[in-house]
Amino acid sequence: MIYQANKRQFGALEGLAHWCAEYYYTLERLGADDAEMPAIRKDVSFCMDRCDALGVPYWAQNAALAWAENWRATKAEYFDAAMAKRGITCKGGATA
């Protein structure tokens, strides 16, 4: 599948990936009982709702989440390159 997002949609996907990576980083480093976990879960939920409101397909959201679950991958590969490998691009080029 191929999905060409506009800049707002692509930015929302990037935000979703960021908070997903933050969730797994915090989970690994500090555990599920860390005081920040409820706020991080709320941020992930907000980002998912934002993607839904902007019309981002679920498979594209899932691709961003699957990439960000391995938070180390977010340190080794740029988001736009990772999404391009999964058929997700941004109209007009990467967001700056």
Which residues are covered by each model-predicted region?
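Non-transmembrane, aqueous-exposed alpha-helical and coiled segments at domain scale
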Residues: M1-A96
